[in-house]
From Swiss-Prot:
Enzyme class: oxidoreductase
Name this polypeptide is given: 4-hydroxy-tetrahydrodipicolinate reductase
Recorded family membership: Belongs to the DapB family.
Domain of life of the native organism: Bacteria
Active-site residues (renumbered): H152 (proton donor/acceptor), K156 (proton donor)
GO CC annotations on file: cytosol
HAMAP family: DapB (MF_00102)
Biological process, per Gene Ontology: diaminopimelate biosynthetic process; lysine biosynthetic process via diaminopimelate
Reactions accelerated catalytically: (S)-2,3,4,5-tetrahydrodipicolinate + NAD(+) + H2O = (2S,4S)-4-hydroxy-2,3,4,5-tetrahydrodipicolinate + NADH + H(+); (S)-2,3,4,5-tetrahydrodipicolinate + NADP(+) + H2O = (2S,4S)-4-hydroxy-2,3,4,5-tetrahydrodipicolinate + NADPH + H(+)
InterPro entries linked to this entry: DapB_C (IPR022663), DapB_N (IPR000846), DapB_N_CS (IPR022664), DHDPR_bac (IPR023940), NAD(P)-bd_dom_sf (IPR036291)
UniProt organism field: Listeria monocytogenes serovar 1/2a (strain ATCC BAA-679 / EGD-e)
Subcellular localization(s) per the UniProt record: Cytoplasm
Length: 263
């Protein structure tokens, strides 16, 4: 498959480039940066042996290169518009950018189905993180008192993380509604109890040195349960990205969540 990478200078995008180069059945045909200084990726020392054009305009890249799939790891500010542009050009998309609303996902799914092309948006591409979310969903049926703590590097722009929100959404499907905390609790400092989703609390931590981590803490009388996943290196996401790229060939719709393509 001929693959282009949008946001290739970001930490995740950079790792995606290396992953595409490693995979025998994937070919890197173009990269995109919002303000490129280079015309070819070989102007970067790490990729000096390659011949891959660098673009600053997404539509121009799609029309000139005509890739089979674009992998997008950019920012919440442009993630939706990028994905819409990719799909409207009839190109498959794998998107790790977060911050999509349910309405945006629905609209993008409609475009994908009208073009009969596959696309996948996932808050997290680490298989371990997907399992963590599935375990939490199952536990929430029996432990409705639960809070989420998600921890990421301090350059992450959105909070809560897509993984935190997706976990809460999945737990809400099986969990009896409980408004977490005392009915008359008072925040001495606004925001101390975190964000609220369907009665659950989500807390976001941003610190240098972190990559992507999350724990889901359940409490009940006389017992507690903690489910935690840690990504220590961004390579933990790459097997999921490669799988998703290949899977788009089999799809004619947009899938939200890596768990929906795992056997």
């Amino acid at each position: 498959m001929r693959v282009a990478v949008s946001g290739f200078k970001g930490r995740m995008g950079h790792e995606v480039v290396k992953t595409v180069l490693r995979e025998a059945d994937l070919e890197l045909v173009a990269v995109l940066d919002h303000e490129p200084k280079e015309k070819n990726i070989n102007e970067m020392v790490e990729f000096s042996s390659l011949d891959v054009p660098v673009f600053g305009n997404l539509s121009e890249m799609l029309e000139e290169i005509k890739p089979d799939c674009v992998v997008d790891f950019t920012t919440p500010k442009v993630g939706y518009s990028n994905t819409k542009t990719i799909l409207e050009h009839g190109v498959r998309a794998v998107v790790g950018t977060t911050g999509f609303t349910p309405e945006q996902i629905s609209e993008l799914r409609t475009i994908a189905e009208s073009k009969k092309i596959g696309a996948l948006i996932a808050p997290n591409f680490a298989v371990g993180a997907v399992l963590m979310m599935q375990f939490a969903q199952k536990a929430a049926k029996y432990f409705p008192n639960v809070e989420i703590i998600e921890l990421h590097h301090d350059n992450k722009l959105d909070a809560p993380s897509g993984t935190g929100v997706k976990t809460a959404e999945m737990m809400a499907e099986t969990r009896e509604f409980v408004k977490q905390g005392a009915a008359d609790e008072v925040e001495l400092i606004e925001g101390a109890r975190g964000a609220e989703y369907e009665g659950m609390r989500i807390h976001s931590v941003r610190l240098p040195g972190l990559v992507a981590h999350q724990e889901v803490i359940f409490g009940a009388e006389g017992q507690g349960l903690t489910i935690r996943h840690d990504s220590y290196d961004r390579i933990s996401f790459m097997s999921g990205v490669a799988l998703s790229v290949r899977k788009t060939k089999e799809l004619e719709t947009l899938i939200y969540g890596l768990e929906n393509i795992l056997d």
